[in-house]
């Protein structure tokens, strides 16, 4: 009996040690990933101060950054006020003199994977420090989101459901509220369909969730004729069709399987540059970084997106990539190489740099 008990103890010991070793390896790996990819440096210096949720009423850049002192990150010089229109004057996306331009003629600062913020619990490899609602107040008029089906529930996630999610209802209610409070603003929302996070994404189910938010789908523009010109900003504002949505990596919206109204196929109407850049030097090599993806599919493409971020995301490098001088030169180089006007400048860590300021500079020049 004693030998039998000893053998049993030996078996338990043999089974236990591998489990302990595996657990230790997983713990160390998690710590390394968190240290390497999460913006710990910036998080620690502020201990993520008591961020105020956005109220929906625009009162300037203070709304975007809450109680973060001007001398702390985010490093936006003088907290540029995107809304440049004088009271009582015609206004479109913060400027008075661009309303006559079509929506496919102007530039939009676009938050890449906008849902994946450290503030909203995306701790492993977040794309942003602060949530997307603040980006709207800061002047970002492009919001890129990834749709996932997590255990039957459609949410916004990045990569895997376990790495963080944001509710579709919550995000779109915030966007809808922002537009209600800012009736001169027009938004671009490119959606990536992620069918690999868990289950497949059903766009009809996604659209149904959108219809549950009062007034949201009424603001969604539908481009009925692929060859027709896109509306001007003024036409979008006057008709209150101020949300322009696109999707990619999902259904192809053929006649036999049409997509919900207003969910346009991105590859049909837009084209992007390369996006897999490991360091700043990769981005600076415009001979390759400005190359077009799927350029053989050019047909009715009216929009041109320039990717301006690293993979995996880099908080430190984003300060340079999102600076006015760097982004201005990248837009110029890619536009010249592709012979296309840039519409989307996709960025991580939107709170760094000054892309909204560059956008207003760029769009103001277009109006001259």
Regions found by a protein language model. Give the residues of each.
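Catalytic cores of phosphodiester-bond hydrolases, prominently lipid phosphodiesterases
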Residues: 2-4, 17, 21-368
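Short, Lys/Arg-rich cytosolic juxtamembrane segment immediately N-terminal
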Residues: 7-17
């Amino acid at each position: 009996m004693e030998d039998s008990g000893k053998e049993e103890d030996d078996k338990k010991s043999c089974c236990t040690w591998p489990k302990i070793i595996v657990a230790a390896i997983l713990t160390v790996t998690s710590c390394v990933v968190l240290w390497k990819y999460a913006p710990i440096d910036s998080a620690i210096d502020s201990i993520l101060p008591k961020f105020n949720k956005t109220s929906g009423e625009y009162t300037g850049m203070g709304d975007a950054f809450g109680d973060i002192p001007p001398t702390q990150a985010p490093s936006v010089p003088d907290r540029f006020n995107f809304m440049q229109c004088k009271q009582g004057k015609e206004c479109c996306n913060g400027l008075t003199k661009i309303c006559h331009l079509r929506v496919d003629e102007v530039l939009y600062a676009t938050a890449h994977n906008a849902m994946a913020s450290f503030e909203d619990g995306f701790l492993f490899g977040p794309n942003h420090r602060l949530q997307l609602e603040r980006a709207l107040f800061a002047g970002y008029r492009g919001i890129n989101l990834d749709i996932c089906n997590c255990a039957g529930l459609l949410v916004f996630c990045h990569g895997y459901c376990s790495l963080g999610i944001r509710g579709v209802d919550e995000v779109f209610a915030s966007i809808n509220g922002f537009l209600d409070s800012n009736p001169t603003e027009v938004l671009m929302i490119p959606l990536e369909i992620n069918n690999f996070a868990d289950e497949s994404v059903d766009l009809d189910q996604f659209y149904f969730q959108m219809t549950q938010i009062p007034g949201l789908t009424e603001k969604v523009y539908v481009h009925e004729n692929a060859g027709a010109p896109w509306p001007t900003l003024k036409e979008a504002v006057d008709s209150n069709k101020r949300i322009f949505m696109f999707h990619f990596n999902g259904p192809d919206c053929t006649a036999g399987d049409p997509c919900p109204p207003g969910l346009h196929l991105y590859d049909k109407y837009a084209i992007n540059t390369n996006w897999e850049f490991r360091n700043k030097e990769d981005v600076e090599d415009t001979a390759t970084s400005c190359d077009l993806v799927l350029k053989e599919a050019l047909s009715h493409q009216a929009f041109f997106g320039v990717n301006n971020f690293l993979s995996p995301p880099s908080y430190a490098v984003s300060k340079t990539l999102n600076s006015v001088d760097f982004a201005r030169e990248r837009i110029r180089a890619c536009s010249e190489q592709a012979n296309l006007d840039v519409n989307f400048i996709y960025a991580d860590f939107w709170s760094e740099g000054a892309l909204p300021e560059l956008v207003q500079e760029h769009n103001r020049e277009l109006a001259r």
